[in-house]
């Protein structure tokens, strides 16, 4: 199986100032950290990628048409993302700090697609898990694999041939609920909390440094998860967080209203920055104001 080939090396999805429509494009400045530039209010321009408008369109071509970013979106829409698979405890030091045995096999759980928000979105802490300190709202910086073509029963040697690109995520977790049960999907699926940003077609530099200490690296992960089932194009895989999460710190560090959370992965992916907001719930009272 030949590796995926495309005309872009970095891809963003955005609403353009010029058209007020959603486009995909390649940032003109190859060295720009798009997420950080967005946070600093800088102008971001991209060459429009012409095709079906989807990052999954392998025949799409980078044009010379320049567009300016008004709103930065996830690199794939919710409709394009087939499944959100996640690995837990995939770094030995993180497993140790959490006082959990290092897994012998990938520790898989799923998140609902409805938990996805874009890089311009707010991390909303739902009222059901407030106050945050009691429910232990935590952050997890993770490297994300984006699958570009159907993969089933893939060997480790050919696993990278199915990778469209890599992106960053912040897997927001509520530790009180996570540690109360053996299945983590409930505690990691509240509201719109999981964040993705831009894709980079690379597996070198900082991505290697980010993943070198993984128990199950990218090749092992794709091969294992494809056995007996199909990883469809548009599937994303969160590969776990390194050590340093909030709930193991002394004192613990939990997310709260007004916090800014920044996740950085190199190799063209860059910074993911979002603000935390606690959900405000209003109740009607018999028709009187």
Swiss-Prot record:
Q: Does the keyword Hydrolase apply?
A: yes
Q: Which Pfam families match?
A: FAA_hydrolase (PF01557)
Q: Which GO terms describe its molecular function?
A: acetylpyruvate hydrolase activity; metal ion binding
Q: List the disulfide bonds.
A: none
* Broad enzyme group: hydrolase
| Catalytic activity field | (E)-caffeoylpyruvate + H2O = (E)-caffeate + pyruvate + H(+)
InterPro entries named in the record = Fumarylacetoacetase-like_C (IPR011234), Fumarylacetoacetase_C_sf (IPR036663)
Q: How is this UniProt entry's protein used in applied science?
A: The availability of a complete eukaryotic luciferin biosynthesis pathway provides several applications in biomedicine and bioengineering.
What residues does a divalent metal cation bind to? 140, 142, 171
Pathway note: Secondary metabolite biosynthesis
ATP-binding: present as a keyword of the record? no
List cofactor names only: Mg(2+); Mn(2+)
Instruction: Could you list this entry's UniProt keywords, alphabetically sorted.
Output: Hydrolase, Magnesium, Metal-binding
* Its EC number(s): 3.7.-.-
Which family, according to UniProt? Belongs to the FAH family.
Known partners and oligomeric status: Homodimer.
PANTHER family in the record: ACYLPYRUVASE, ACYLPYRUVASE FAHD1, MITOCHONDRIAL
* Task performed by this protein: Caffeoylpyruvate hydrolase; part of the gene cluster that mediates the fungal bioluminescence cycle. Involved in the recycling of oxyluciferin, a pyruvic acid adduct of caffeic acid, to caffeic acid. The fungal bioluminescence cycle begins with the hispidin synthetase that catalyzes the formation of hispidin which is further hydroxylated by the hispidin-3-hydroxylase, yielding the fungal luciferin 3-hydroxyhispidin. The luciferase then produces an endoperoxide as a high-energy intermediate with decomposition that yields oxyluciferin (also known as caffeoylpyruvate) and light emission.
Q: What is the recorded name of this protein?
A: Caffeoylpyruvate hydrolase
